[in-house]
Amino acid sequence: MSIRAEEISALIKQQIENYESQIQVSDVGTVIQIGDGIARVHGLDNVMSGELVEFANGVMGMALNLEENNVGIVILGPYTGIKEGDEVRRTGRIMEVPVGEALIGRVVNPLGQPVDGLGPVETTETRPIESPAPGVMDRKSVHEPLQTGIKAIDALVPIGRGQRELIIGDRQTGKTAVAIDTILNQKGQDMICIYVAIGQKESTVRTVVETLRKHGALDYTIVVTASASQPAPLLFLAPYAGVSMGEYFMYKGKHVLVVYDDLSKQAAAYRELSLLLRRPPGREAYPGDVFYLHSRLLERAAKLSDAKGAGSLTALPFVETQAGDISAYIPTNVISITDGQIFLQSDLFFSGVRPAINAGLSVSRVGGAAQIKAMKKVSGTLRLDLAAYRELEAFAQFGSDLDKATQAKLARGARTVEVLKQDLHQPIPVEKQVAIIYALTRGFLDDIPVEDVRRFEKEFFLWLDQNGQHLLEHIRTTKDLPNEEDFNKAIEAFKKTFVVSQ
């Protein structure tokens, strides 16, 4: 069968008309140097700062240094399989993490990948880890209390929803314990908690997760962990991943608490990256933008206005000091960014005052507006009593004869210190805190021996559960003190049943 020439030309025309050229254009660069988790890449001329790039073996990186002839990229994973001459592609995306309800109760790494062995996290939404903080008009002043369940904090340095309160102290002074107790106390408060562990030992993170699980707190908590064995970029990104997961809930009108444990290790990881990228070092070898590293993170904590859904994100950043030096670079930076600090002192911790809060150096700049009326009334003189006690304590050591007023101040101070002590993982509801502090500040404990004060408190709480429920209910619902006469009578009635140890 012969094919005519015109048929051939018609077929060729048809083929030409149907031809579609699909050219895929992608920016590709070449690795010119690799080592210490940093790659220098030539040829990625249009890459953006903070953009994700993909190496030939599938490992992702993040462009941090944009220089004249090359790009400095930090590698977010194992870098042993990457070699000189390898291809690197732009992705056109910035770093994002999965967000949503499915993360609650899970332990994930800073990339949102589960590390708890419970299978994949079923989320569909993501959020960029870097996003602008709410503006001035989108915010509302802090006015709702965030009860930590720790008497010394709720009475002396109250925290409000949307506040940033720094927890600062040497290692082994109970910083993590304060945060865990605060998370445990949020049970039933419609609060979502996010615990970000930065550079912690994996065994420590495991202990924290088990504590949360034992107390039923994992039902409303997300744990983000970048352990000490992980590459520095993951330690640097962990807090931003945590706050992004929290912002998802905040913009839905919910209340979130984020704990960063701790930012000193994040700053050290960022210093490591900056020095490897050959950025000029500043004070203590930190880069010049280490202040911005923390300020852009902590500014994302906010109490949103009603128009924006009235959600809140409260931040509890930790900073570890060396030998109690709070005038070092990172501590002073974070103190100036936050709305107050809780200073934990090792001397107090080792002398048995736990939580070891130094009332003189601890302050809450906005929390006073969030304190409930009842607590405001009873704790007004507490800080002054403690300050006077610490001052007089130094003089009393010389053993000279003291007048009656001084002895009374010392006695009240010693009882105040005892009342503010608290056992680990036993947060106390605010109405019971008000009751014991009321008894203290109104002088009902002045004739109780100091060694019996803790026992008095325990038995008083049990007595209130049985005989004083109406008083506790009044404080809980009205946020104010009940009739003082009734309160005094109740305390007197309990005191009659209390047996002082011989």
Curated annotation (Swiss-Prot):
Localization (cell): Cell membrane
InterPro entries attached to this UniProt entry: ATP_synth_asu-like_sf, ATP_synth_asu_C, ATP_synth_asu_C_sf, ATP_synth_F1_a_nt-bd_dom, ATP_synth_F1_asu, ATPase_a/bsu_AS, ATPase_F1/V1/A1_a/bsu_N, ATPase_F1/V1/A1_a/bsu_N_sf
UniProt site positions, description: Required for activity: 362
Main location group: membrane
Any one GO molecular function term: proton-transporting ATP synthase activity, rotational mechanism
EC number of the protein: 7.1.2.2
Catalysed conversion reaction: ATP + H2O + 4 H(+)(in) = ADP + phosphate + 5 H(+)(out)
Region (Disordered): 115-139
Domain of life per record: Bacteria
Membrane topology of the entry: Peripheral membrane protein
Cellular component per GO, a single term: proton-transporting ATP synthase complex
Binding of ATP, residues: 169-176
Keywords for the protein's UniProt record, in alphabetical order: ATP synthesis, ATP-binding, Cell membrane, CF(1), Hydrogen ion transport, Ion transport, Membrane, Nucleotide-binding, Translocase, Transport
Function: Produces ATP from ADP in the presence of a proton gradient across the membrane. The alpha chain is a regulatory subunit.
Family stated for the protein in its record: Belongs to the ATPase alpha/beta chains family.
HAMAP family for the chain: ATP_synth_alpha_bact
NCBIfam families listed in its UniProt record: atpA, PRK13343.1
Subunit annotation: F-type ATPases have 2 components, CF(1) - the catalytic core - and CF(0) - the membrane proton channel. CF(1) has five subunits: alpha(3), beta(3), gamma(1), delta(1), epsilon(1). CF(0) has three main subunits: a(1), b(2) and c(9-12). The alpha and beta chains form an alternating ring which encloses part of the gamma chain. CF(1) is attached to CF(0) by a central stalk formed by the gamma and epsilon chains, while a peripheral stalk is formed by the delta and b chains.
Record protein name field: ATP synthase subunit alpha
Species for this entry: Geobacillus thermodenitrificans (strain NG80-2)
Gene: atpA
